[in-house]
């Protein structure tokens, strides 16, 4: 489709104990890639769609000569604190307000799968692609974390639109 994003609105879940959301959507497609995820804040959904359209697809075409068909994620909403950091452990994660997404795998048009866990430390095209799209997340998200940040992120990219700023 020519749309950058296909999504439907999700009913608000009023915040309780720092968890919940307003103005969230469920994305079914972004930048031409199929996608299935839980509720995501409108600003995070917009950032995600722009990232797929202007970073993921161009990188896939440049490196593999084809587009990404689908993107797998580990989730959007989760009522919890930040994981993997002693300093931030008492702060609510952006996942607690559906303002973050964890991306784990990409599938190309020919069925080739690219996994953050398996391919990040490789030497070939898959690693090149993952490093390009991880860095590209910094254009659209306030926080971009990947396997080089800490062990908690060894198998996914964390992207969010919260108050903090970090490109790792």
Locations of regions flagged by a protein language model:
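N-terminal start-of-chain detector that recognizes signal peptides
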Residues: 1, 42-45, 72-79, 87, ...
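Active-site acidic/histidine clusters and adjacent loop/turn architecture
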Residues: 1-72
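A short linear-motif detector with a strong N-terminal bias
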Residues: 4-7, 48-52, 79-85, 94, ...
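Catalytic cores and adjacent binding grooves of peptidoglycan-active enzymes
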Residues: 16, 57-58, 89-168
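Short, solvent-exposed polar/charged micro-motifs at secondary-structure junctions
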Residues: 16-22, 79-85, 156-158
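Residues that form or immediately flank small-molecule/cofactor binding pockets and catalytic motifs
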Residues: 32, 75-76, 121, 164
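Active-site-adjacent substructure of cysteine-protease-like catalytic cores
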Residues: 62-98
